[in-house]
């Protein structure tokens, strides 16, 4: 009888430990990296192959990672879909994406990693002392897909919030990152805020991705000239003033990754700073010690395809390339030249250093990078590596504290 009581107490204590949120380390300056498990093809790996793969990447100067894609998906019934509960999967959402193509949620489901692989990923970063966030995505901008169906139902949203938070805690995540910057309707945006607010109430750290506090025609014309309409929903429905004013989230990750100067035909840090200043002017208190929300500045580790390289809707080159591809094609010029091959604009390592220093000076709480798969590789010389440049600047900030 005594042994049975001991076992019951252990089970109760274990369940309490599992249900408790993991406490994130307080940081003077955050450096977060988005890690897409599916883009790293981890769904094809065995658990024993995880560490050798991640060891190929440069994790210097990183305090947090957000695991995006490949861990879980949202079921339209409010369930958590994983590779290990395949027998419980609900039907996929049937709809059209923003390009007019059929939503292919099934393809994404087939790229979910095994539980053993996910556990190895978590163990890898924990051993490095890196905090882990779990990213919630809709898998379809401007329709929401299955997530959109959940967000349109309040009771389902609350149920899903509890499931999502419990799931994240089981893997030792400190927070949830919400990467659905374009809710297509006011109702879905409301549900999205409810999901974030409930997640924070349940004790998790919460971050949300953003581009602009407001969206106007000038922004659309200058940000993504060919796909301006894709960005028109965010400022219309997200209600950033409510999110900031009520402290619904802990971090806002501002995804102004690139800043193209059409006159210079290259990336321009001054254009980047103009974009950053829109947030600084809209919410000046959030860039002081009195902030309710931490503002993180995004840096894109990929190329911008020059408009001049396009003929109508046809692209003469290969389109936007990641840095592995650029380095293979152009060598060190891909890292030192602002304009590569007459068709790709990129940040140089000097640009990255300048952005990190300026973000800190202007009161941004940190920086984040999109995306691990591109410029984190250790295959290239570190002096040409953007992540190494960022790491050195971030580590200098940490040392000064």
Label every PLM stretch briefly:
Residues 1-24:
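Bacterial Sec-dependent N-terminal signal peptides
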Residues 22-274, 279, 291-298, 305-352, ...:
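Chitinase-like catalytic core of GlcNAc-active glycosidases
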Residues 357:
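Histidine-acidic metal/acid-base catalytic patches
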Residues 401:
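Conserved catalytic region of serine esterases and O-acyltransferases that act on ester linkages
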